[in-house]
């Protein structure tokens, strides 16, 4: 059965997960037979959905029924695009691609703020991971001030592989990190993608090695005990600089 974005019951959830439709979260009741729980966990991971174990009473409250059969799925808040869709959007506008990639941004408020800046600075879309980062939830949409519903979002299984594909298509990939080159010393025109790392550990070393360049934001007051910008603030600064350089290039 389905109530708006909530699908519950063993067969409906199984069919939804196998269909490839966007699913953000699968809830599995505590106490479900281990083999059955493992089956739905495997299906959910294959579909790129987050799995949460919850008390049966909570599942009843969230589905509005006792007939949930121990499992429910929550559909994605938006229709996700593909990376190819994002590149095609740039081509349709006659512009070099300008993409933002999340390498594990976890806080939905940060992701929403990044999306807002990306839209206002002219990015053609944002790429987020299926696992290991925030997906587009109601909190993200609210934090983005509506940008999440206007900015194309692609969700991929592997950010590293996506970077490789973008580079093959002539996109120059930068990431933001403290040991990079000062922001304004970089040429940020042309086909470009900016990778932003997680709040705790930043861009992963594997992803960093794949990037063509690393940009750094300088600080006017070093030694204060505050050693970095919030990821959404850093994103806004870098994205504005990219927008400015691209405007001059035109």
Feature annotation, model-predicted:
Residues 4, 103, 183, 219-227:
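Short pre-catalytic strand/loop immediately N-terminal to key active-site residues, enriched for Gly-Thr
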Residues 4-89:
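N-terminal positively charged helical leader segments and presequences
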Residues 14, 120, 141-147, 209-250:
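Structured adenosyl-cofactor binding patch, chiefly the S-adenosyl-L-methionine
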Residues 18-22, 88-181, 185:
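RNA substrate-binding interface of SAM-dependent RNA methyltransferases
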Residues 31-32, 131-133, 199-201, 219-225:
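Short, acidic/turn-prone active-site loops that include or flank metal/cofactor-
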Residues 36, 133-139, 201-210:
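Short, glycine/polar-rich helix-capping loops at beta-to-alpha or helix-loop-helix junctions
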Residues 45, 163-167, 243:
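Surface-exposed amphipathic alpha-helices with a cationic face
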């Amino acid at each position: 059965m389905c109530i708006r974005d909530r699908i519950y019951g063993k067969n409906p959830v199984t069919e939804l997960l196998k269909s490839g439709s966007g699913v953000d979260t699968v809830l599995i009741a505590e106490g479900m037979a281990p083999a059955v729980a493992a089956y739905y966990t495997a299906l959910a991971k294959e579909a790129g959905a987050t799995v949460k174990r919850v008390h049966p009473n909570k599942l009843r409250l969230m589905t509005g029924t006792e007939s949930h059969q121990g499992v429910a799925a929550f559909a994605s808040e938006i229709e996700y695009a593909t990376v190819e869709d994002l590149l095609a959007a740039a081509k349709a506008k006659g512009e070099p691609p300008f993409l933002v990639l999340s390498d594990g941004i976890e806080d939905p408020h940060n992701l929403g703020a990044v999306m807002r800046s990306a839209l206002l600075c002219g990015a053609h879309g944002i790429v987020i991971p299926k696992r290991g980062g925030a997906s587009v939830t109601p909190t993200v949409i609210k934090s983005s001030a509506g940008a999440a519903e206007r900015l194309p979002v692609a969700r991929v299984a592997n950010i590293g592989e996506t970077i490789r594909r973008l580079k093959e298509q002539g996109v120059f990939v930068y990431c933001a990190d403290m040991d990079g080159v000062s922001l304004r010393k970089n040429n940020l025109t042309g086909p470009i993608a900016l990778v932003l790392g997680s709040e705790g550990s930043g861009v992963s070393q594997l992803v960093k090695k794949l990037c063509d360049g690393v940009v750094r934001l300088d600080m006017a007051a070093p030694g204060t005990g505050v050693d970095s910008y919030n990821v959404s603030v850093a994103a806004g600064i870098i994205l504005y600089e990219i927008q400015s350089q691209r405007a001059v290039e035109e």
